[in-house]
Structure formats: structure tokens, C-alpha cells
Design a protein with these regions (language model features):
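Bacterial N-terminal signal peptides
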Residues: 11-21
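Flexible, surface-exposed loop/linker segments and immediately adjacent secondary-structure boundaries
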Residues: 26-150
Length: 150
């Protein structure tokens, strides 16, 4: 190995390590299936359109405008529907499709949200929660709706 190739290999190794780390961090956890009106996704300080087909990641914040609504399917088949003037944060999400084990924590900061629970909550009812500014809701059934006025 020549002296010039050693730094090149180190640099290449660092680039590959960073690429793998960024891919591992950006795991898709769900997808927008229905989008009407003004819908946006805030991710890492940037705002992107909440269009049909947009992939969602942990820590995404979905915002709907006065004419907006959004339908989301998570990888465990949970269905989320947010109405106008809603702010929904996907705080924590982990799902193993082999065992149906996982954890799904979200926060509704304002607006309305309807949920049909998927495989995570069916496997372990304590594993899915929705926080609001005044309460923490544990999913014990298969369907529920919540509204936050501000």
C-alpha cells in the first residue's frame, strides 16, 4: 500500500460510514395515501409537500391547513386521518413485521385525528399512544378519534 492510498482509503471509509448512517436513520415508517388541500411535512428543519405517495419518517410533523386533510398508512397498517388545521407529530416508531412487535407514539398538537390501529396495537395494546397537550391516550381498542382545540 502506498502512502497516498492510505488517506484515500480512510476518506472513502468515512464517506461510506456516513452514507450508511444516514440511510439507517431515514427509515420509511408510513406513507401518505390521501392528501387534500394544504398538507405539509416538516422534517429536519425543512418543509416538503405532503403529497400522495410521500414517505414518512420518525420525527416528521404533518401539518394541514384550513382546507387540508391527510390519510396515512403506517407500515404496521395503522390508519391515521388528520382533519383541517391539524399538527401531528410521529414521535417514535419501531415495527418488526415478523413478530408484529413495536412501539408507536405520536402527538396531536392541534386539530383532529382518527385512528384505526394496526398490528402494533393488536399485538400489544400498551405499545401505541397519542399525546395531546392535556392527555396521553393509550390505544385499547381498534378505532378512536380525538380533537384538540387551540
Amino acid at each position: 500500500m502506498t502512502a497516498a492510498s492510505a488517506p484515500s482509503r480512510v476518506a472513502l471509509s468515512l464517506v461510506l460510514a456516513l452514507a450508511v448512517a444516514s440511510v439507517a436513520h431515514a427509515i420509511d415508517i408510513g406513507q401518505i395515501k390521501v392528501s387534500r388541500g394544504d398538507v405539509a411535512i416538516e422534517r429536519g428543519g425543512q418543509t416538503v409537500p405532503g403529497a400522495v405517495g410521500a414517505r414518512l419518517q420518525t420525527s416528521d410533523v404533518i401539518k394541514t391547513g384550513t382546507d387540508g386533510s391527510v390519510g396515512i398508512t403506517m407500515s404496521d397498517n395503522s390508519l391515521l386521518s388528520a382533519g383541517p388545521n391539524s399538527v401531528l407529530s410521529l414521535d417514535k416508531y419501531a415495527f418488526d413485521a415478523t413478530t408484529n412487535q413495536g412501539q408507536f407514539d405520536s402527538s396531536l398538537r392541534k386539530g383532529s385525528l382518527s385512528v384505526v390501529s394496526g398490528r402494533i396495537a393488536k399485538q400489544s395494546p400498551d405499545a401505541m399512544t397519542v399525546r395531546t397537550p392535556t392527555a396521553i391516550l393509550g390505544v385499547r381498542g381498534t378505532e378512536f378519534a380525538v380533537s384538540v382545540d387551540q
